[in-house]
Amino acid sequence: MFLDGSTGAGKSRSLLIPTIDLLTYGADDGESRPQTIIVSDVKSELIELTGDELERRGYRVLLLDAQHPEKSDTFNPLEMVDRLANGGNLPGAEQAADAVARTLIAGEGDAKASHWTESARSLLAATILLVVLDEGCPRGCKHLATVYHIMCLGTEGAGEDPCEPLKGLFRSLPQGHPARSRASQFISSGGNELRSIVSTLKVNLRIYASAPIARMVSGDDIDPSRILSEKTALFLHVMDEGSPYNAIAAVLFEQLYAAVYSIADAAGGKLPRPVSILGDEWGNLPKVECLPSLLSLGRSYDLFWMGAVQNISQLNKYGERDGRKKILANCGVKVAMKLGEAEDRQYFTELVGKTTRHTMGTSSSRGPSGGTGSTSYSEHADDLIHPWEWTEMSPDKDGVIVVKTAENGVGREHAGCFRAPVCDCTRMPTKEHFDLGTREHEAAKRMEYQARLISRQMGREDGVDLWTPEFEEEAAEPPVADGWSGLFVD
């Protein structure tokens, strides 16, 4: 489901909170089986208003909050890599490390920047595999804070090449080691190329030098396999678009989708419990690589997505050919609430379609001998909703426009274009279910929930253990200049 609504359209209170209520209501032995929900939450409003009731309904309520890590449960992106490696699935561990690196280091547009980006991703994947596969690294140290720690120590050498300690560490690995092959570009780089690779990586990883963030990414409270198997409500605090902290949530989505296949296969082709992703302000997240595939194949596994954006252009990061078009095409339900951009208005005008307008024209004339008259009839196709009409529509007064694609086995009366009324969640049964009410009442409810989240840090230390590999004491000798050295271009 795709939901398009600019700021102030009422997405959260009119649709998202009631949807959370609907998806989690009922008993496991009843006809309406509660689903696992994964919710991106911009203001932490959704968990603060619904968390207490979800716990009473038997849900394990989790929060991933990089802005306030002291409130957050823990999620270790390296845990899946380590689990696959320990299970003897080294190719799977390599793919998982590559996926973490690809998500944490944002892509660039131009070709030159893409080279630095891809090289930095390879170096990050190499360092992740170095940490995970080294038997001398304690399990409690296998996290991103250790990866950044090694990256900094290994690129601050005192010799002519500050990166020689890290290069030497990778050179000391056996030829068949997966970390060495991924570090090859880094090992052979120098000059401006080397500086660009290292700086790109450090800029994207520096947040893991923070002690609270390091603690947040060092534990396994949030386990993708467990979330997909148990009755869980996971809330992800999403920050402004472009924030590096959002990449942690994007990694979690990638690992959740990667775990779907093995869990569904073990359960006969379906997940043990249906899972719905409610993506409020989905455009704030960095590119989630698996989203197009999730929309194409997820429903067959009982995995569903409802994404809310402020405008369609927020999907441009997925690319026009195989990304954005594929996402929109695979959303069987599209909802227009309040369209602020011309592109969005034009898109939904074309999507809603046209109607036939019948017109009648009359004419008359007078002359010396009297008057004559004629009547003509015509018909023409016209937009059902003109682009300019969207600006005059208000969801609370005019409802929302829903376009639903026909499905096999579902009657035609359930497909087409509809105008659906919406209202605030305090005018629905959801009000009693989640104890909602006046602004003052809800503000007090939210503050009480925040206080309980903050109490988690009482008596808890943010420090984490770091592992330091044995770097070579002496840097390797620099290459001897020869007749070819002048051909090297930085």
Model-inferred region functions:
Residues 2-303, 389-416, 421-490:
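P-loop NTPase motor domains
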Residues 295-297, 301-401, 465, 482-488:
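Conserved ATP-driven motor cores of ASCE-family P-loop NTPases powering translocation/secretion/packaging/pilus
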